[in-house]
Design a protein with these regions (language model features):
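Rossmann-like adenosine-cofactor binding region
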Residues: 255-346
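Conserved active-site and cofactor/substrate-binding residues in soluble primary-metabolism enzymes
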Residues: 6, 10-13, 36, 78-81, ...
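Glycine-rich phosphate/diphosphate-binding loop of Rossmann-like nucleotide-binding domains
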Residues: 184-295
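Glycine-rich, N-terminal phosphate-binding loop and its surrounding beta-alpha-beta segment
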Residues: 40-114
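Glycine/serine-rich phosphate-binding loop and adjoining beta1-alpha1 elements at the start
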Residues: 75, 94-220
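Short, Gly/Pro- and small/polar-rich lid/capping loops
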Residues: 2-42
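Adenosine-phosphate binding glycine-rich loop
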Residues: 2-6, 204-205, 321-466
Length: 466
């Protein structure tokens, strides 16, 4: 994994390239680039084995729109510079898919696997308390979400602690997204980033930009290798497999898998969660080293693990026509340039993995409305469909089966609505980027995505007199 300094340098370099291409005045460019504030938080917690002091960060990159939005990462490797780079990326990611948030990110230096659930809850609640003290979490100012090392459980603790500290805030549960459904979370948030990758690829394959690659056929006919089978990688693999694509390779830290005819991703995920002992894996012929799978031929490579996994030292090993960035910053800036020169098209992270914040936006809106999606329309839709079916039966003289009637009458579920909204946001964002790319002949889709988002920030800053 690349160092934190390499990560922030890479994000900054990619931003600088876009700014230079756009020709933005230096002072305004520095305003857009600068991280507005980074808060270092140290706090002690009394655990089962004594008092321990933890260090966390919350960076706010841009408040051109509020609240600011970005996840909280639990990792022993997290640092202030990493959090700042991710906050910067969040600003542009939010702008690309047109959600009304500025960019923020948080991190806690901790290995969560080393602590009991009871201790982890204490740590999370204390961290939340420190964030609340500093105005770094609230429905109107700063709204965290899950990231590496965190999930629904941690978000539930954060939401509950915020509500305990702010008992009169009717919108308290909107202080964080990615919560369990019974606390105001939405069905589909866990899969959102991975499914968003599928929608990003589908949008690309449905565009004329496909002609810019050496890829033949539609998305269903592609062979795909995915680096990282965590939440992002698994749900991307699942959506792509269900669409008809073939997942031929999975790269994990300690063990990788390859089968040119396709892998059983559910089997692999279960094995990774339950055993991870090579001798226990049932299909021994599918076990390979990381380097062997990394360099295997494929149509699409999806790095979905962590930042800096593709560098100037290993980019030449890749044998792919297209890269879709599932992780934040998986390519260093030099690797990005080398691969572009090599003719490999890259769908960048600030667009490709924006599905998570898109669905977080839906959850935040739902929490403010205090009403589940579809509540006002469900019965009306059922009556409309029933009337339509009756007209069809009368006009054709044919009876429609009960199964078909039930399917049409039940209407869309919450996850149907969430997926529909996510697909619309990802499709519209790609169409807008593609139009700009083809009109201006920018050097890459990444540069185009940055320029597209930077233009929105420029407009926001000009509106407030900067």
């Amino acid at each position: 994994m690349g160092s934190n300094n390499v990560f922030i340098k890479s994000v900054t370099k990619m931003f600088d390239n876009a700014i230079q291409t756009l020709g933005v005045e230096k002072g305004l460019a520095n305003q857009i680039k600068s991280c507005n504030s980074t808060h270092t938080i140290r706090f002690g917690v009394k655990l089962t084995d004594g008092i321990k002091v933890f260090t966390g960060w919350r960076a706010v990159h841009s408040e051109h729109l509020e609240p600011v939005k970005g996840g909280i990462r639990y990792s022993p490797a997290v640092s202030a510079s990493e959090v700042e780079a991710m906050a910067m990326l969040m600003t542009f990611k939010n702008a690309v898919i047109d959600v009304p948030f500025g960019g923020s990110k948080g991190g806690l230096k901790i290995n969560p696997s080393k602590y009991s659930e009871e201790d982890l809850e204490k740590i999370t609640r204390r961290f939340t308390e420190e964030l609340v003290k500093r105005g770094l979490i609230s429905p109107s100012l700063n709204v965290p979400a899950p990231d590496m090392g965190t999930g629904k459980k941690e978000m539930a603790w954060i939401a509950d602690e915020y509500k305990r500290l702010n008992p009169h805030d009717i919108n308290a549960y909107a202080c964080v997204t990615g919560k369990p459904e019974n606390m105001g979370g939405v069905d589909g948030r866990t899969e959102a980033t991975g499914r968003g990758i599928f929608f990003a690829l589908n949008s690309f394959f449905n565009s004329s930009d496909l002609k810019k690659t050496k890829i033949k056929g539609n998305l269903k006919s592609q062979k795909i290798i995915i680096e990282g089978l965590g939440k992002v990688g698994y749900f991307a693999a699942k959506a792509l497999r269900d669409h008809g694509a073939t997942i031929i390779g999975i790269i994990e830290k300690d063990q990788s898998f390859y089968n040119p005819k396709g892998l059983d991703i559910d089997l692999i995920r279960t094995w990774l969660n339950e055993s991870s002992e090579a001798k226990d894996y049932p299909n021994q012929k599918e076990l390979f080293s990381k380097d062997e799978v990394f360099s295997a031929a494929c149509d699409i490579f999806i790095p979905a693990a962590t930042e800096g996994t593709i560098t100037e030292d290993n980019f030449h090993l890749l044998n792919t026509k297209l890269i879709c960035e599932g992780a934040n910053g998986p390519l260093t800036s030099r690797a990005d340039q080398f691969l572009n020169d090599k003719g490999v098209l890259i769908i960048p992270d600030l667009y490709a993995n924006a599905g998570g914040v898109a669905v977080s936006y839906f959850e935040w809106v739902r929490n403010l409305q205090h009403m589940r999606f579809g509540r006002m329309e469900k019965r009306r839709k059922e009556y409309e469909n029933a009337s339509l079916l009756s007209v069809i039966e009368t006009s054709t003289g044919s009876k429609i089966s009960s199964q078909t009637k039930n399917l049409l009458n039940q209407g869309p579920s919450e996850i149907d609505l969430v997926r529909s909204g996510l697909e619309d946001m990802m499709t519209e964002a790609y169409e807008n980027m593609s139009e700009i790319w083809n009109e201006n002949k920018y050097d890459s889709l990444r540069t185009t995505a940055y320029i597209y988002s930077i233009k929105k920030l420029i407009e926001s800053y000009r509106n407030i007199g900067i």
